Regions:
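A short glycine-rich, Lys/Arg-flanked "PGG" loop and its adjoining helix->strand segment in the class I
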Residues: 166-178
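Conserved alpha-helix/loop element of class I SAM-dependent methyltransferases that forms part
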Residues: 60-79
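N-terminal auxiliary segments of SAM/dcSAM-dependent transferases
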Residues: 14-38
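Class I SAM-dependent methyltransferase SAM/SAH-binding core
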Residues: 81-83, 90-141
Length: 262
């Protein structure tokens, strides 16, 4: 039979089998389950599959991360701090540790309010114990920054209550040294009602192309309702300017995803 001549797709070596099993273990199937959460939370279940979730849910995620690293490299200053606010599993911090070892005494700090995410990040960066510090904290009035050369928010501001965004951005502005920079990657709304739904549909097509079912996409959208609250890009840029930043520009855009440098 013809099928018998087809090459086997089964993993042949032990290393390949381990890699396959790891991929299955860390694959995002949270919204496949009929008992999937009705409200999205950054708990241990999400932390376990979060890297896969980002890769399959955020268009051009790696390219955007690399752009962010390049900005941080340009802004990195000895004896100053680079903060990743909402660091999740520490993927950006891992890239940074590999990219800026030549700049002495730059302090990398990951901040997240999810203990599960912080634990995952600590494990991921266990080979770099002296390079990165972690803080479990909410980004509210009580959080204090050290003198910063760069502050990054990767798809984090969209989860902050809208009324708390302006004071947080003001605090970020005041924490940056002269010449420091703020890098903001964010899900946004179209400026035009007519295009908004098309952007959403194209994003759903992207997810389908990365293995998510229609049901998973729908259930996740419902779970994120009032948890992830995107604004129009013009509104977010206005908030950044009102915080004190005089130079604000878009360095990345994919339909309803944008990257800002300020």
């Amino acid at each position: 039979a013809m099928s018998s001549r087809l090459p086997s797709t089964r993993p042949t070596t032990r290393r390949e089998r381990i890699k396959r099993d790891e991929a299955i273990k860390h694959r995002d199937d949270i919204f496949l389950d009929k008992n999937s959460p009705t409200k999205f939370e950054f708990d241990s279940g999400v932390a376990e599959v979060f890297d896969d979730m980002l890769e399959r849910s955020v268009p051009l995620y790696r390219e955007c991360q690399n752009l962010t690293v390049n900005w941080c490299k340009r802004l990195a200053t000895p004896d100053k701090y680079i903060y990743d606010l909402g660091c999740s599993t520490g993927s950006l911090l891992l890239l940074l540790t590999k990219s800026i070892p030549t700049i002495p005494r730059v302090h990398l700090i990951g901040v997240d309010n999810s203990a599960a995410m912080i634990n995952k990040a600590r494990n991921k960066l266990s080979n770099f114990p002296d390079s990165v510090g972690f803080v479990k904290a909410n980004l509210d009035d009580s959080f204090l920054f050290n003198d910063s050369c760069a502050i990054v928010m990767n798809y984090t501001l969209q989860f902050i209550p809208v009324e708390n965004r302006a004071p947080l951005l003001k605090k970020i502005y005041e924490s940056l040294m002269p010449g420091g920079g703020f890098i903001l990657n964010e899900k946004v709304l179209s400026e035009h009602e007519l295009l908004s739904e098309t952007f959403v549909e194209m994003h759903h097509d992207f997810k389908k192309g990365h293995g998510y079912s229609k049901m998973e996409i729908s259930k996740k959208r419902d779970a994120l309702e009032n948890v992830l609250v995107p604004l129009k890009l013009s509104k977010t840029m206005a908030l950044v300017r009102e915080a004190g930043f005089t130079t604000v520009d878009i360095f990345f855009k994919w339909n309803n995803f944008a990257g800002l440098i300020a």
